[in-house]
Amino acid sequence: MVKLGFVIAEFNRDLTFMMEKLAEEHAAFLGADVSCKIMVPGSFDMPLAIKTLLQKDDIDAVVTIGCVIEGDTEHDEIVVQNAARKIADLSLEFGKPVALGIAGPGMTRMQAEDRIDYGKSAVEAAVKMVKRLKEIQ
């Protein structure tokens, strides 16, 4: 059974809550176990929590769940670009999948509501990567 850790952003919690629930349902459907969840203030705050989960022997992969909505400045782009870069770096550093389930940047609130399946897609990617990496080890 694949053991997942979830890192969930509290910012835009109404949306990340729906993303989290869909992700949990999909994990159960795939036969994966969500072993641990860590709530962080926002997507930019995820890397340290991800690193903490990746250090645990009982976590096979981490799923990120966040939602970054466009504002009047380029803040949303900076947040997502930096979070995505660090997330990829951590995956390579620890040799474990970290799936990007962050919706944004450059989207309106209505577009964000249409993208709540990003968490589900991230679970799918994480489980597939764990299984495929085990096949070649």
From Swiss-Prot:
Q: Which GO terms describe its cellular component?
A: riboflavin synthase complex
Annotated 5-amino-6-(D-ribitylamino)uracil binding sites: F11, S43, F44, D45, C67, V68, I69, L100
At the top of the EC hierarchy, this enzyme's class is transferase
Which Pfam family is one of those matched by this entry?
DMRL_synthase
Known pathway: Cofactor biosynthesis; riboflavin biosynthesis; riboflavin from 2-hydroxy-3-oxobutyl phosphate and 5-amino-6-(D-ribitylamino)uracil: step 1/2
Listed binding positions for (2S)-2-hydroxy-3-oxobutyl phosphate are D72, T73, R115
Its Gene Ontology molecular function terms? 6,7-dimethyl-8-ribityllumazine synthase activity
Where along the chain is the active site annotated?
H75
Instruction: Tell me which domain of life the UniProt entry assigns to the organism this sequence originates from.
Output: Archaea
Stated EC number for the protein is: 2.5.1.78
**Any GO BP annotation:** riboflavin biosynthetic process
Reactions catalysed: (2S)-2-hydroxy-3-oxobutyl phosphate + 5-amino-6-(D-ribitylamino)uracil = 6,7-dimethyl-8-(1-D-ribityl)lumazine + phosphate + 2 H2O + H(+)
Q: What is said about its interaction partners and assembly?
A: Forms an icosahedral capsid composed of 60 subunits, arranged as a dodecamer of pentamers.
By sequence similarity, the record places it as follows: Belongs to the DMRL synthase family.
Which NCBIfam families is this protein grouped with? lumazine-synth
Its biological purpose: Catalyzes the formation of 6,7-dimethyl-8-ribityllumazine by condensation of 5-amino-6-(D-ribitylamino)uracil with 3,4-dihydroxy-2-butanone 4-phosphate. This is the penultimate step in the biosynthesis of riboflavin.
Q: Which PANTHER family match?
A: 6,7-DIMETHYL-8-RIBITYLLUMAZINE SYNTHASE, 6,7-DIMETHYL-8-RIBITYLLUMAZINE SYNTHASE DMRL SYNTHASE LUMAZINE SYNTHASE
Put simply, this protein is called: 6,7-dimethyl-8-ribityllumazine synthase
The species this protein belongs to is: Methanococcus maripaludis (strain C7 / ATCC BAA-1331)
Q: What is the lineage of its organism?
A: Archaea, Methanobacteriati, Methanobacteriota, Methanomada group, Methanococci
